[in-house]
């Protein structure tokens, strides 16, 4: 005999079905919309949060992070951008999920200047980038290769010291000009094989424009409907002109090397092979299984030559400015350098090994002024990812790490606004970003491969400067009155020239 089923028992599977449906809809929707839970300033139609970037974006974003938190969501036009201003968020992006965030967003200006983004710094993640970076790391900027250029660094710093000594007859010198000339000459000899006279080639002006263009915010990349503005403002024409001039210059350099190779006029000076030599050997030989095309060769050269010159100079300029503002730190550095030099007429790179305060000075300058990138070059997620284990971030989202803000975070640094090199004397903080508190060269897969070369130039130049001269500000300028106004491009420079009085020791 069949027992009638109570009517309410029929509701059980209905309730189960409704529960599962609600559970699925709620959690699926929640997962997709979790990014909306990120703190976010109110955005405007079309432009999003672009109006909040200001003339100094690293400072504007730092101010916003103080209100909305160390991880926040902005929109540049319609594109979502995560801004990270904390050690934890930086570590999550550049270490925990480094592979996911290893690509770069497309930039139309960079594309046109670097042969379709065939350089290492801006190339999207993939097999081409792996091969290009491998060439840079193993063949151009290995520790062995960096050491092979020590004679170039020694000769050019000695030349700079001589020129400053000649200029001491006048009461005031422009130290910034000497520092800029130093870095230009060193990197030109290392990358291109010789220095190029500005009147002969105009290369310094071309490179200055190149670096300026790399730092321009191109609204067309974020609001495609406004791409026409670049033609109206003349930006498109300027990019085209600079790209053409750079290409013509690099072609001349490469052809010079090819002709010299045919005549077998190499090594007569005993100098190490320059970057063009190495890249041409790779192109023509079997050192790698990577077919290095002409455009790729030129793009890789641009990375090392153009970007390296500007950032190294800016770091030296900021460091000397900070030391002039802090006479006590300058005196401590001079005492260390002169004491360890032990009466030697010339500082060598071997003498630098025991100069702990020198390294602390450089780290402190890079903490306050991460000239390579106050805002690290944007990364782009290649797939969905959970940020800090909580926020679900969709693929193709950009991430900007505010290295300037992290270097001034009171949770990581005591008295963060004060210049105190002593904080690094017993610290494990490294300029290569291993603990993510100090990020002047980025970190992870997209970290700058030229950090060792840059530090080698900076250390020797600073040591020789404070060994040979006493420095002071011009009469009437107090240390606290030295103008430290910034100007922004792909690097963060001081805006005004560094004028000093140099007295030979």
Curated annotation (Swiss-Prot):
Cofactor(s) listed in the protein's UniProt record: heme
EC assignment: the record states: 1.14.-.-
Asked whether the UniProt record includes Transcription regulation among its keywords, one would answer no
MF terms in GO: heme binding; iron ion binding; monooxygenase activity; oxidoreductase activity, acting on paired donors, with incorporation or reduction of molecular oxygen
- The membrane spanning regions, by residue number, are 7-27
Cellular compartments per GO CC: membrane
Question: Where is this chain primarily localised?
Answer: membrane
Give the keywords, sorted.
Heme, Iron, Membrane, Metal-binding, Monooxygenase, Oxidoreductase, Transmembrane, Transmembrane helix
Q: Which residues bind heme?
A: 448
Keyword set includes Transferase: no
Q: Which family does it belong to?
A: Belongs to the cytochrome P450 family.
Protein's recorded name: Cytochrome P450 71A2
> What is the scientific name of the source organism?
Solanum melongena (Eggplant)
């Amino acid at each position: 005999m069949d027992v009638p089923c109570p009517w309410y028992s029929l509701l059980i599977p209905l309730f189960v079905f409704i529960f599962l449906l609600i559970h699925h809809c709620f959690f699926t929707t929640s997962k997709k919309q979790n990014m909306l839970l990120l703190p976010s300033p109110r955005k405007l139609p079309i432009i999003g949060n672009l109006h909040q970037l200001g003339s100094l974006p690293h400072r504007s974003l730092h101010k916003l992070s103080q209100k909305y938190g160390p991880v926040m969501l902005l929109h540049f036009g319609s594109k979502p951008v995560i801004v990270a201003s904390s050690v934890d968020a930086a570590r999550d992006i550049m270490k925990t999920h480094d592979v996911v965030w290893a690509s770069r967003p497309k930039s139309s200006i960079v594309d046109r200047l670097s042969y379709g983004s065939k350089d290492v710094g801006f190339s999207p993640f993939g097999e081409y980038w792996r091969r290009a970076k491998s060439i840079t790391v193993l063949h151009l900027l290995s520790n062995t290769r960096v050491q092979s250029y020590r004679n170039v660094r020694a000769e050019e710093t000695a030349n700079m010291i001589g020129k400053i000594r000649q200029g001491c007859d006048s009461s005031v010198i422009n130290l910034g000009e000497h520092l800029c000339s130093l870095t230009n000459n060193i990197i030109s000899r290392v990358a291109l094989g010789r220095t190029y006279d500005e009147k002969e080639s105009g290369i310094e002006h071309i490179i200055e424009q190149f670096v300026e263009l790399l730092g321009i915010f191109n609204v067309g990349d974020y609001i495609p409907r406004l791409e026409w503005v670049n033609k109206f403002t003349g930006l498109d024409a300027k990019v085209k002109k600079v790209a053409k001039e750079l290409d013509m210059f690099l072609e001349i350099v490469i052809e010079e090397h090819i002709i010299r190779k045919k005549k077998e006029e190499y090594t007569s000076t005993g100098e190490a092979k320059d970057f063009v030599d190495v890249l041409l050997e790779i192109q023509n030989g079997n050192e790698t299984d990577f077919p290095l095309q002409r455009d790729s060769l030129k793009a890789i050269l641009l990375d090392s030559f153009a970007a390296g010159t500007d950032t190294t100079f800016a770091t030296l300029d900021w460091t000397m400015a900070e030391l002039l503002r802090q006479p006590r730190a300058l005196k401590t550095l001079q005492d260390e350098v002169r004491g360890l030099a032990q009466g030697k007429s010339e500082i060598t790179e071997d003498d630098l090994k025991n100069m702990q305060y020198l390294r602390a000075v450089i780290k402190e300058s890079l903490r306050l002024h991460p000239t390579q990138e106050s805002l690290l070059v944007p990364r782009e997620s290649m797939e969905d990812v959970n940020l800090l284990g909580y926020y679900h971030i969709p693929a193709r989202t950009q991430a900007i790490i505010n290295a300037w803000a992290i270097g001034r975070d009171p949770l990581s640094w005591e008295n963060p606004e004060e210049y105190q090199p002593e904080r690094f004397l017993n610290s494990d903080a490294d300029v290569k970003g291993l603990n993510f508190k100090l990020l002047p060269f980025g970190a992870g897969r997209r970290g700058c491969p030229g950090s060792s070369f840059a530090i080698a130039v900076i250390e020797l130049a600073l040591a020789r400067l404070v060994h040979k001269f006493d420095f002071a500000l011009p009469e009437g300028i107090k240390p606290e009155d030295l103008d430290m106004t910034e100007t922004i491009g792909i690097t963060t420079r001081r805006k005004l020239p560094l004028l000093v009085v140099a007295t030979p020791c």
